[in-house]
From Swiss-Prot:
Residue ranges of domain Deacetylase sirtuin-type in the record: 40-312
Active site feature: 161
Protein purpose: NAD-dependent lysine demalonylase, desuccinylase and deglutarylase that specifically removes malonyl, succinyl and glutaryl groups on target proteins. Activates CPS1 and contributes to the regulation of blood ammonia levels during prolonged fasting: acts by mediating desuccinylation and deglutarylation of CPS1, thereby increasing CPS1 activity in response to elevated NAD levels during fasting. Activates SOD1 by mediating its desuccinylation, leading to reduced reactive oxygen species. Activates SHMT2 by mediating its desuccinylation.
GO CC annotations on file: cytosol; mitochondrial inner membrane; mitochondrial intermembrane space; mitochondrial matrix; mitochondrion; nucleus
Stated name of the protein: NAD-dependent protein deacylase sirtuin-5, mitochondrial
Domains (record comment): In contrast to class I sirtuins, class III sirtuins have only weak deacetylase activity. Difference in substrate specificity is probably due to a larger hydrophobic pocket with 2 residues (Tyr-105 and Arg-108) that bind to malonylated and succinylated substrates and define the specificity.
Superkingdom assignment: Eukaryota
EC number assigned by the record: 2.3.1.-
Protein species of origin: Monodelphis domestica
InterPro entries given in the database record: DHS-like_NAD/FAD-binding_dom (IPR029035), NAD-dep_sirtuin_deacylases (IPR050134), Sirtuin (IPR003000), Sirtuin_cat_small_dom_sf (IPR026591), Sirtuin_class_III (IPR027546), Ssirtuin_cat_dom (IPR026590)
UniProt keyword Transit peptide, yes or no: yes
Length: 315
C-alpha cells in the first residue's frame, strides 16, 4: 500500500471511530460489476437518486473554475512563463527562489480577484441551502484555492488545498485572511505570465512579512498542496475522507480525478455501491467506475442536475 493510500485510509478510520461507525467491506463481485458497467448519462435517473439522498458530497476541481476564466495550469499550454505550476508549488522551489514563487501566486491572486463565481458555483450553493431546510446535508469538497464556492454562498465547505487569500507566518504558524492586492508593494506590476518576462528577483526583505513578528509569510495552502505536503494529515483533519464512508450520493464536478487526495474519493465511494456522478467536459481514467457521467460545461449541466426535484418537500 502506498503512503498516499495509507494516509487516506488512516484518516478514514479516524473519522469512523469518532462517528462510531465501521468501514463496510468492499465485495469483490461489486468491484467487478462496477468496473465492467458503463456510466449512464440519463439525467432523470440521476435526479431520482438525488431526490432520495440524505448525505451528498460534491467534489469540485479546476474545471468548474475554468468556466469563470481561471487558468487551470494543466494539460497542453498549462505553464506560467516556462514553469509548470507543480514545479513552483514545492518547498524546494520556495526555498530556492521565493521571489519567483511569490510572483507566480501574485499573478494567480490578481487573476482570481477579477473573476466571479459562475452558474455552477451558484447552483451548488443554492442546492446546499435548499436541502438543509429539508434536513439533508450537502458538503462541498474543493481542490480549488479561489474561494468561489464561499463567494457564491456555500457554507459547508472543505478547501483541500487551502486558499490564495490566507497567509501563514513562517515563524509562529498563525494564519490570517489577506485580500490586499498586491500583497506587498514589491509585487506591484510583477508576475506577468509571458515566457519572456524577466524574473523580478525581489530581495528577500521586500517579500511579504508578518506584521507582528516581522517574519516571512507564505500562502496558506493546505492538505495535499505540494507546497505543504506535511499538512496532509492535520488540515481539515477528518471531513473529506469521512464523506467517502458516509455519503449516499457523490458528485464529481470538473475534476480530472488525477489530483490526490480528491482523486481517490470518487472511486472509493463507488466501490461501496454509492452512486457517483461525474460532470466534466471529458472522460477521466476512472469514469467507467461511476454510475453516471454527464459531458458538457458545468455551468450548464450542474444547474439542471441540482434543481429542485418534483418529489422534494416544499414547505
Amino acid at each position: 500500500m502506498s503512503l498516499l493510500h495509507f494516509a487516506t485510509r488512516r484518516l478514514i478510520l479516524q473519522v469512523l471511530r469518532e462517528l462510531g461507525l465501521k468501514a463496510p467491506p468492499v465485495h469483490k463481485t461489486l468491484k467487478i460489476c462496477i468496473a465492467m458497467s458503463r456510466p449512464s448519462s440519463n439525467m432523470a435517473d440521476f435526479r431520482r437518486f438525488f431526490a432520495r439522498a440524505k448525505h451528498i458530497a460534491i467534489i469540485t476541481g479546476a474545471g468548474v473554475s475554468a468556466e469563470s476564466g481561471v487558468p487551470t495550469f494543466r494539460g497542453p499550454g498549462g505553464f506560467w512563463r516556462k514553469w509548470k505550476a507543480e514545479d513552483l508549488a514545492t518547498p524546494e522551489a520556495f526555498a530556492q527562489n521565493p521571489s519567483l514563487v511569490w510572483e507566480f501566486y501574485h499573478y494567480r491572486r490578481e487573476v482570481i480577484l477579477k473573476k466571479h463565481p459562475n452558474a455552477a458555483h451558484v447552483a451548488i450553493a443554492a442546492c446546499e441551502e435548499r436541502l438543509s431546510l429539508q434536513g439533508r446535508r450537502v458538503v462541498v469538497i474543493t481542490q480549488n484555492i479561489d474561494e468561489f464556492h464561499t463567494k457564491a454562498g456555500t457554507k459547508n465547505i472543505l478547501e483541500l488545498h487551502g486558499s490564495l487569500f490566507k497567509t501563514r507566518c513562517c515563524s509562529c504558524g498563525n494564519v490570517r485572511v489577506n485580500y490586499n492586492n498586491p500583497i506587498c508593494p514589491a509585487l506591484e506590476g510583477k508576475g506577468l505570465p509571458d515566457p519572456n518576462a524577466p524574473d523580478a528577483q525581489i530581495p528577500l526583505e521586500n517579500l511579504p512579512r508578518w506584521k507582528t513578528t516581522g517574519d516571512f509569510s507564505v500562502l496558506f495552502l493546505l492538505d495535499a498542496s505540494p507546497l505543504y505536503p506535511s499538512n496532509l494529515s492535520c488540515s481539515h483533519p477528518v471531513g473529506a475522507p469521512a464523506l467517502s464512508e458516509v455519503a449516499d450520493l457523490g458528485r464529481w464536478v470538473g475534476t480530472s480525478s488525477l489530483v490526490y487526495p480528491a482523486g481517490m474519493f470518487g472511486p472509493h465511494v463507488a466501490l461501496r455501491g454509492i452512486p457517483v456522478a461525474e460532470f466534466n467536459t471529458v472522460t477521466t481514467p476512472v469514469t467507467q467506475n461511476f454510475r453516471f457521467h454527464f459531458s458538457g460545461l458545468c455551468g450548464t449541466t450542474i444547474p439542471e442536475a441540482l434543481s429542485p426535484h418534483e418529489s422534494e418537500k416544499t414547505g
